[in-house]
Amino acid sequence: MASRQGPLCGLAPCCLWLLGVILLMNASARPANHSSARERAGNREENEILPPDHLNGVKLEMDGHLNKDFHQEVFLGKDMDDFEEDAEPRKSRRKLMVIFSKVDLNTDRRISAKEMQKWIMQKTAEHFQEAVAESRAHFRAVDPDGDGHVSWDEYKVKFLATKGHNEREVAEKIKNKWDLNIDEETQEVLENLKDRWYQADNPPPDLLLTESEFLSFLHPEHSRGMLQFMVKEIIRDLDQDGDKKLSLSEFISLPVGTVENQQGQDVDDGWVRDRKREFEELIDANHDGIVTMAELEDYMDPMNEFSALNEAKQMIAIADENQNHYLEPEEVLKYSEFFTGSKLVDYARSVHEEF
């Protein structure tokens, strides 16, 4: 008996080590995705003055990744936090059916594409209002003298202060045009921010941002010009042949320069499949296999009613098991993970309970 256990015990550490290596390889092989609103964290002061990486109700992130929370953001709106994984299932099912009733405008116990479109536009407007309120508070943080304008130099001082630099010393150096002695990475971030600052500065440019211009700086989805700038940035990062358009192969590839993730590109079939479906069904409006800047801009514009209708149809199609082009209570509950991020069990029984 002892002679049999010895070799097995000796194998255990080896097996554990091998398992760890496999898990590590799998994790590093998958494309980076910083698209979840629930995963964002960081320095609070820095977050207040930096443009957010994630924009609620916008289909693509700033880095070109799909916003994996998008469907929940436009279906739940402010109620997103109520559907965390640890929420009580029965309570969550009831809330989901309350939302269903609100979307179902004609009370026929089914949701049409038009009803879903109106709901998406309503939830997007809520996100817009939240962004305006946040931007107003953040503007006050970078406009200490309260003159209603923020200069690029004022903003730069505040930004470097969040990076650990002494605010008074930085202000003095900028005033006297002395070397700031900042690292290369921070300098690159500053240059990108300055480009964005210029874009948000409405003609005639004076490098002074008003409160509304500062909103566009933080949230490009609020300004046609800044939305176009965001589209150009994304195409620049994904466009491999320099034609200022995107082919399917370019869109499903990782952005140029993310070398650490490219080895895992073929591994993550789900990531590629999702982007392929998005490209073919929603972004490439004329289905010619090429996405232009205009097409990408229409797709990314949160207040584009045509895009909202297409999105509504796609959301219905995903859960429409009886293929009648409507969403019914049973279908919404069964596909609750798609709509809320949480899987709610016993969906069939729940329909009768909640109605």
UniProtKB/Swiss-Prot annotation:
Amino acids binding Ca(2+) 5: 320, 322, 324, 326, 331
UniProt binding sites for Ca(2+) 1: 104, 106, 108, 110, 115
Residues where Ca(2+) 3 binds: 239, 241, 243, 245, 250
Domain of life from the UniProt record: Eukaryota
Subcellular location(s) of the protein: Golgi apparatus lumen
Main location, first listed in the record: Golgi
Residues annotated with Phosphothreonine modification: 186, 210, 258, 292
Bridged cysteine pairs (disulfide): none
GO terms of molecular function: calcium ion binding
Residues with Phosphoserine modification: 92
GO CC terms, sorted: endoplasmic reticulum; Golgi lumen
Protein residues bound to Ca(2+) 2: 143, 145, 147, 149, 154
Keyword Oxidoreductase: no
Annotated signal sequence range: 1-29
Region (Necessary for intracellular retention in Golgi apparatus lumen): 302-355
Keywords, alphabetical: Calcium, Glycoprotein, Golgi apparatus, Metal-binding, Phosphoprotein, Repeat, Signal
Residues bound to Ca(2+) 4: 284, 286, 288, 295
Residues bearing glycans: 26
Single GO BP term: calcium-ion regulated exocytosis
Domain EF-hand residues, every copy: 91-126, 130-165, 226-261, 271-306, 307-342
Role according to the record: May regulate calcium-dependent activities in the endoplasmic reticulum lumen or post-ER compartment.
Domain remark text: Binds calcium via its EF-hands.
Family: Belongs to the CREC family.
UniProt name for this protein: 45 kDa calcium-binding protein
Name of the gene encoding the protein in the UniProt record: SDF4
